[in-house]
From Swiss-Prot:
<dbReference type="GO" id="GO:0008615">
    <property type="term" value="P:pyridoxine biosynthetic process"/>
</dbReference>
<dbReference type="InterPro" id="IPR000192">
    <property type="entry name" value="Aminotrans_V_dom"/>
</dbReference>
<dbReference type="InterPro" id="IPR015421">
    <property type="entry name" value="PyrdxlP-dep_Trfase_major"/>
</dbReference>
<keyword id="KW-0963">Cytoplasm</keyword>
<dbReference type="InterPro" id="IPR015424">
    <property type="entry name" value="PyrdxlP-dep_Trfase"/>
</dbReference>
<dbReference type="InterPro" id="IPR022278">
    <property type="entry name" value="Pser_aminoTfrase"/>
</dbReference>
<dbReference type="InterPro" id="IPR015422">
    <property type="entry name" value="PyrdxlP-dep_Trfase_small"/>
</dbReference>
<keyword id="KW-0808">Transferase</keyword>
<dbReference type="Pfam" id="PF00266">
    <property type="entry name" value="Aminotran_5"/>
</dbReference>
<comment type="subunit">
    <text>Homodimer.</text>
</comment>
<feature type="binding site">
    <location>
        <position position="172"/>
    </location>
    <ligand>
        <name>pyridoxal 5'-phosphate</name>
    </ligand>
</feature>
<keyword id="KW-0028">Amino-acid biosynthesis</keyword>
<keyword id="KW-0718">Serine biosynthesis</keyword>
<dbReference type="GO" id="GO:0004648">
    <property type="term" value="F:O-phospho-L-serine:2-oxoglutarate aminotransferase activity"/>
</dbReference>
<feature type="binding site">
    <location>
        <begin position="237"/>
        <end position="238"/>
    </location>
    <ligand>
        <name>pyridoxal 5'-phosphate</name>
    </ligand>
</feature>
<dbReference type="GO" id="GO:0005737">
    <property type="term" value="C:cytoplasm"/>
</dbReference>
<feature type="binding site">
    <location>
        <position position="195"/>
    </location>
    <ligand>
        <name>pyridoxal 5'-phosphate</name>
    </ligand>
</feature>
Length: 361
């Protein structure tokens, strides 16, 4: 059966070669006589898998030596709840910049444990732009400043790293990590759920400057303590080994493809194809986001009549283009163009959009 182009926002498409390798190794892996999902996480075999995944991720993202890398169970929402526990002292404030749905989720999770303050909020303008960093209201003694690098639902993306002075900048990179070069030294911490650009759902990556791990934070169990997790190489308890293995295969694939420089080129080409179809449609398709902050990863757009949405989704599915229905919070159509989406997928979508407009415009 031919694989379709899957535009799902997450869990998202994975490289076919990675899936084929995982399929081939599922029953018996690496000559050990058992599946990768059956061997101990503390065995020499799996420890080698974990070490290779970290080494490859460090190479892919050019992670400085003074940053620790954690592989954690669960997703980004879990991390959002743990950030104040690990990095904010009791009674200390943390600043949040709200540029879409996931920024709102981040501050909601944090507010249970910290004085979570809104430094800037783009909701009044419909989340179509990102407030300039110079306009943010930052607390001088804030534990950190949190941003969402790319908003998957509203389709806005920070195209430059904001300057927050000496405050640690924390960022959710779940949907844009490894999509282009990133100067990690500008951040105190970045994190990402794997299920968009790094692998399958169920595992996340936290990259944190080591000196921040010395903060006392708030009383918490060892399992929620990032310093303890770093000391135990992300194996304080049994990790999601299958997910970790798949993440490692995906990261290695990205390196073999040419690394983040190559994916930046591909992602720019894919985004230009879809935005070109929107902007060249004479208003039949509409994207509401200011051009300077348009996401390259997630492109929401709207048709002239919402009654056409279901027809667009059904016809596109029949054409081998999957998961184009927009998020329920905003409606419309959404195309997610993560690293594993080939340029051919964006070409096919742009061609379908032109054909659909010719028939229904």
């Amino acid at each position: 059966m031919t694989r379709a182009f899957n535009f799902s926002a997450g869990p998202a498409t994975l490289p076919e070669s990675v899936l084929r390798q995982a399929q081939a190794e599922m029953v018996e892996w690496n000559g050990v006589g058992a599946s990768i999902v059956e061997i101990s996480h503390r065995s020499a075999d799996f420890m080698a898998v974990a070490a290779a995944a970290e080494a490859d991720l460090r190479s892919l993202l050019s992670i400085p030596d003074d940053y620790a890398v954690l592989f954690t169970a669960g997703g980004a929402t879990t991390i959002q709840a743990l950030l104040p526990l690990n990095f904010a002292a009791p009674g200390q404030a943390a600043d949040y910049v709200i540029t879409g749905h996931w920024g709102k989720t981040a501050i909601k999770q944090a507010a249970t444990y910290v004085d979570a303050r809104i430094a800037a909020d783009a909701q009044a303008d419909g989340f179509v732009d990102i407030p300039a960093a110079a306009s943010w209201t930052l607390s001088p003694h804030s534990a950190y400043v949190h941003i969402t690098a790319n908003e998957t639902i509203h389709g806005v993306e920070f195209r430059d790293t904001p300057d927050v002075g000496t405050l640690p900048l924390f960022a959710d990179f779940s949907s844009s990590i490894a999509s282009e070069p990133l100067d990690i030294s500008r951040y105190g911490l970045i994190y990402a759920g794997a299920q968009k650009n790094l692998g399958p759902v169920g595992i996340s990556v936290v990259i944190v400057r080591r000196d921040l791990l010395e903060r006392a934070g708030q009383p918490r169990a060892d399992i929620f303590n990032y310093a303890s997790q770093v000391a135990r190489d992300s194996m304080l308890n049994t990790p999601p080994t299958w997910n970790w293995y798949l993440l490692g295969l995906t990261v290695k694939w990205m390196l073999e493809q040419g690394g983040v420089q190559e994916f930046a080129r591909r992602n720019a080409e894919k985004a230009a194809l879809v935005y070109g179809a929107i902007d060249g449609s004479g208003g039949f398709y509409r994207n509401l986001i200011k051009p300077a902050v348009r996401s390259r990863m997630n492109i929401p757009f709207f048709l002239p009549d919402e009654r056409l949405d279901a027809l667009f989704v059904s016809e596109s599915k029949a054409a081998g283009l999957l998961a184009l229905k927009g998020h329920k919070a905003v409606g419309g159509i959404r195309a997610s163009l993560y690293n594993a989406m080939p340029v051919a997928g964006a070409q096919a979508l742009a061609a379908f959009m032109h054909d659909f407009q010719q028939r229904h415009g």
